[in-house]
Amino acid sequence: MSNLGISECPSLSIESACGSGSVSFREAYANVAAGFYDAVLVTGVEKVTHTGTEWTTTYFSYCSDFFYEGQAGASFPGLFASMARAYLNEFDATEEDLASVAVKNHDNGLSNPKAHLRKKITIDDVMNSAVVASPLKLFDCCPFSDGASSVVICNEQFAKDHSKDYVKVIGLSLIHI
């Protein structure tokens, strides 16, 4: 930060595998809501495509909790599949309902020229793609990608002072699995 002329600026690095963005957002929100800061900049970056799929898959497998998950043979797709199965059961949803999320996400990617996957897919495409970890199929899962994003989390007064258009956070949760 000193290279930018910013001194005495606290920073925090959060590593939470596939949940790093969500955990970082929540941490920033909690600090602003508690009144510790008026505004917090959350930035996330991932650069992995240069390493190749095999190396990246191996590396990511070390990011889980070895004692509780690794020894049981759990993988991130397996853990996400367990959560997806629980969701399907609790909300009486179908695998086609899950597939509609992938279709929506791909549709959003079509409007972004920098999206990793710019391909229209259908529910049938998702349903007929290879099973990764039931009920998740290939098109339900994200590929390793490079990307970055930032968001400013601030209190309402800061938002009003700096922008006429802002979004209010009306709900936020974090669960432990």
Predicted feature residues:
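Condensing-enzyme catalytic core mediating Claisen C-C bond formation in acyl metabolism
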Residues: F66, E90, S100, V131-I175
